[in-house]
């Protein structure tokens, strides 16, 4: 923007704009002018591209035309949504002065800043997904990370010890906006993320952070929150809170506490595991065919968001899990009655956040009233549930009869969208408002009486009394009778076929009515603000109620899913291990047209690793993933898809399943595979569940086999993790003979001619055949290629019998086994030309060959 240098040459209005823009140089400024928000200079050019709106010019200032783009004020939410989705931030500048009394430009100021991580408006948020603002800090000891959901007040911090853990946290939370210090060293960690915001170093100072947080919570120290000894997390939290206050331009009373998230409290899953298990997002980036898509039939948006948080942070405290299990069991007979009532509660959590920010709209208060109206029925239904946790939730949700009564008296049944539209406050709530409204609403009766009286007095049958927005009240007489108008009629407007007049009495009434409308609207706005003052003292109790209602929704939903999908309650045991009878994949069984083949699983300290073999498409990956998903579901307290499950303590879940080139980071498929494998070998423990699928595929046969063997050996002997190890290297099926705690299982298939039928059934022992050519034929590889492959296979088998796919001691040998060393006798015979030998030489060769054998 080439405008600041010649500031004095600009018009007063543009000087005002430039001052405001200088305070917000890096974000778009929406500058209110009448019924439009205008953007100027570079902002206008940028907005025209981002929003696909016209770029025009507005006169000239300082001798140059001003690039300009504008949007109507009533459509601002739609445009803000588009900008926020593209990671943009916008400063909203409103007229706060009165144009009638202003000398020079009307006074304006920025009233709020809309950023991707601090939005609370319903139109800008995805209702079933958390919208997080995050801050990241790093020093020599590790990372500090804080997140805030401003639409609920949920404030969390953590201190990831290393880069891998930090990557996993970023993927788990997926913030809409991320604040980082200007000297942040690990830029490769956050590059390419949406909503990145560079902040000055002083915003991350620990003393400033403590002061900010104590001021927010009204405390002297942070010991009560359990975060006192988390300096790196506090640095991030302090910056985050300051940014939230700067953008909202108001107090944040709904942010009442901060919670420390500790690694030892939940099952840790790295970024690769979250991606491969498709918990809330599938591998293509969508939400279809994910674990959440099967489990989430919650009836409130806040319940849906809570369930997704549970899925991404499975808890390790079995007391919490047993309580959830018991609650789900107790609720199974009540889901049909509870869910329709819960559905009416809506998104109370986010409504309360808007109330706290004083941005709640009339329909928010109407929805809050509707939520309160459901509480008596909910409480009555829950009274019959024989469960201490359910009764605790019932008490926590409260009843709020006084607030319900207040909103029933104060707000009409179906209020308009905005307070400025008027007609929000119900009749009978305020006597003065009723009087002003009566004066304004009584105009119709008065005009009808005036019309009758004036017709009789003047004898003019074409006389009418009316009103329009431009000229106000008038008396209209047709052109043919206008010459008979009384002398006290003052002409106001001439039409083609009529004249319009005003009389002193009508003018006086007009002033009174217009004044009454203005006063009624002003009083209505005042009463609406007073409603906030009456509701906000109850904010803490209301937030507890919303949290209880969301949790009830999640538990009722899990009870309904358990009953509908035939899930069973898992049993927690003290020793490491997983025993599953008739286990099923929760997602695959829902998308299959035929019945899902259930399979058993047995992992224990004596049987720590399963080597899984079988054909591609046989179901190895499904079997492995279903084990991890059953474990994950058990550790959120849910019932699971199996006939019976016993599960021991788990600290981490790792998956090394499939890979693609990471082109952005310049890493090959094999490099990605080895990086993920290294992470597992460094961090897995005897309490970890590890899924390893096809390790070593991305390199040469011998390198790959050697790596796979060494990894399996390390996991089984040194780490002793519970491991499912799928492989095409049949040499690995010898591992059970060489070490304890390892067993072979395989997924079977039947081959008939050129066709193959996958049984999807897990059997003990190693696979007998790879079925590679049959799978290739099934995939549509041309017949001549399959035919040539069969010829080549026979050729290889005949050349090197040891390399053939034959069964040796119950173990299938690799097609590419190392050939045995050729004997000297064979080498000598190969170099011999029998036609050139004399009888004596032939006899000598017989003795020589005899000595070589």
From Swiss-Prot:
One of its GO terms (cellular component) is cytosol. GO terms for molecular function: ATP binding; ATP-dependent DNA damage sensor activity; damaged DNA binding; mismatched DNA binding. ATP binds at residues 614-621. It holds the Pfam family MutS_V. One of its GO terms (biological process) is mismatch repair. The keyword DNA damage applies. InterPro entries: DNA_mismatch_repair_MutS, DNA_mismatch_repair_MutS-lik_N, DNA_mismatch_repair_MutS/MSH, DNA_mismatch_repair_MutS_C, DNA_mismatch_repair_MutS_clamp, DNA_mismatch_repair_MutS_core, DNA_mismatch_repair_MutS_N, DNA_mismatch_repair_MutS_sf. It comes from the Bacteria. Keywords: ATP-binding, DNA damage, DNA repair, DNA-binding, Nucleotide-binding. Belongs to the DNA mismatch repair MutS family. PANTHER family: DNA MISMATCH REPAIR PROTEIN MSH1, MITOCHONDRIAL, DNA MISMATCH REPAIR PROTEIN MUTS FAMILY MEMBER. This protein is involved in the repair of mismatches in DNA. It is possible that it carries out the mismatch recognition step. This protein has a weak ATPase activity. This is DNA mismatch repair protein MutS. It comes from Escherichia coli O81 (strain ED1a).
């Amino acid at each position: 923007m080439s405008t600041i240098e010649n500031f004095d040459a600009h018009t007063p209005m543009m000087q005002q704009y430039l001052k405001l823009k200088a305070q917000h140089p890096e974000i778009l400024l929406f500058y209110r002018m009448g019924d439009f928000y205008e953007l100027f200079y570079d902002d206008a050019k940028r907005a025209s591209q981002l929003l696909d709106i016209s770029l025009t010019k507005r006169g000239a200032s300082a001798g140059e035309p001003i690039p300009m783009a504008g949007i109507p004020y009533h459509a601002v939410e739609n445009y803000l949504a588009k900008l926020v989705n593209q990671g943009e931030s916008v400063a909203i500048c409103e007229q706060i002065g009165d144009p009638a009394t202003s000398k020079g430009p009307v006074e304006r100021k920025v009233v709020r800043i809309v950023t991707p991580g601090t939005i609370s408006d319903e139109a800008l948020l995805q209702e079933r997904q958390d919208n997080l603002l995050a801050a990241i800090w790093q020093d020599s000891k590790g990372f500090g990370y804080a997140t805030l959901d401003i639409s609920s007040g949920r404030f969390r911090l953590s201190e990831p010890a290393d880069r891998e853990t930090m990557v996993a946290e970023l993927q788990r939370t997926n913030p809409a906006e991320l604040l980082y210090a200007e000297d942040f060293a690990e830029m490769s960690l956050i590059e390419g993320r949406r909503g990145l915001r560079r902040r000055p170093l002083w915003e991350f100072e620990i003393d400033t952070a403590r002061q900010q947080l104590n001021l927010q919570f009204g405390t002297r120290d942070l010991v009560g929150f359990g975060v006192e000894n988390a300096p790196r997390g506090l640095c991030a939290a302090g910056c985050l809170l300051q940014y939230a206050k700067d953008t909202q331009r108001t107090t944040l009373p709904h942010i009442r506490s901060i919670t420390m998230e500790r690694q030892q409290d939940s099952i840790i899953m790295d970024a690769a595991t979250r991606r491969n298990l498709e918990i809330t997002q599938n591998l293509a980036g969508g939400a279809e065919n994910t674990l959440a898509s099967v489990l989430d039939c919650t009836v409130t948006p806040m319940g849906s968001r809570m369930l997704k948080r549970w899925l991404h942070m499975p808890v390790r405290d079995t007391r919490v899990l047993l309580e959830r299990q018991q609650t789900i069991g107790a609720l199974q007979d009540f889901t049909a009655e509870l869910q329709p009532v819960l559905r009416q509660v809506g998104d109370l959590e986010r409504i309360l956040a808007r109330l706290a920010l004083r941005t709640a709209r009339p329909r928010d208060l109407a929805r809050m009233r509707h939520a309160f109206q459901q509480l008596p029925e909910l409480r009555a239904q829950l009274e019959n549930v024989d469960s201490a946790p359910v009764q605790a939730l019932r008490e926590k949700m409260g009843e709020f009869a006084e607030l319900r009564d207040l909103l029933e008296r104060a707000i009409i049944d179906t209020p308009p969208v905005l307070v400025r539209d008027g007609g929000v406050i119900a009749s009978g709530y305020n006597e003065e408002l009723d009087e002003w409204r009566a004066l304004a609403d009584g105009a119709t009766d008065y005009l009808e009486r005036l019309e009758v009286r004036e017709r009789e007095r003047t004898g003019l049958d074409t006389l009418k009394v009316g009103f329009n927005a431009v000229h106000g009240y008038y008396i209209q007489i047709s052109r043919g009778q206008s010459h008979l108008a009384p002398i006290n009629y003052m002409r106001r407007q001439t039409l083609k076929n009529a004249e319009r007049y005003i009389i002193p009495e009508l003018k006086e009434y007009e002033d009174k009515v217009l004044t009454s409308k203005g006063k009624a609207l002003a009083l209505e706005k005042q009463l609406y603000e007073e409603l906030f003052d009456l509701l906000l003292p109850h904010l803490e109790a209301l937030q507890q109620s919303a949290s209880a209602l969301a949790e009830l929704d999640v538990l009722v939903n899990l009870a309904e899913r358990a009953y509908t999908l035939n899930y069973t309650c898992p049993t927690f045991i003290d020793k490491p291990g997983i025993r599953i009878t008739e286990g099923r994949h929760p997602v695959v069984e829902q998308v299959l047209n035929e019945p899902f083949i259930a399979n058993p699983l047995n992992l224990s300290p004596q049987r720590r690793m399963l080597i899984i073999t079988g054909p591609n498409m046989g179901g190895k990956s499904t079997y492995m993933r279903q084990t991890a998903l059953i474990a994950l579901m058990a550790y959120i307290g849910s019932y699971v898809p199996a006939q019976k499950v016993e599960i021991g303590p788990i600290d981490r879940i790792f998956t090394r399943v499939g890979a693609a080139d990471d082109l952005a980071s310049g890493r090959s498929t094999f490099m990605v595979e080895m990086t993920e494998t290294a992470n597992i070998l460094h961090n897995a423990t005897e309490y970890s569940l590890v899924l390893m699928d096809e390790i070593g595929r991305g390199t040469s046969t011998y390198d790959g086999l050697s790596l796979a063997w060494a990894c399996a050996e390390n996991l089984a002997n040194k780490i002793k993790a519970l491991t499912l190890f799928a492989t095409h290297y049949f040499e690995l099926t010898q591992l059970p003979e060489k070490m304890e705690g390892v067993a072979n299982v395989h997924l079977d298939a039947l081959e008939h001619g050129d066709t193959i039928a996958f049984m999807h059934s897990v059997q003990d022992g190693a696979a007998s055949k790879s079925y590679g050519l049959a799978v290739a034929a099934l995939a549509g590889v041309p017949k001549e290629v399959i035919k040539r492959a069969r010829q080549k296979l026979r050729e290889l088998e005949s050349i090197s019998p040891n390399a053939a796919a034959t069964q040796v001691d119950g173990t299938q040998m690799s097609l590419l086994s190392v050939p045995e060393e050729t004997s000297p006798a064979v080498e000598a015979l190969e170099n011999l030309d029998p036609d050139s030998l004399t009888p004596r030489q032939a006899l000598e060769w017989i003795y020589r060959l005899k000595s070589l054998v």
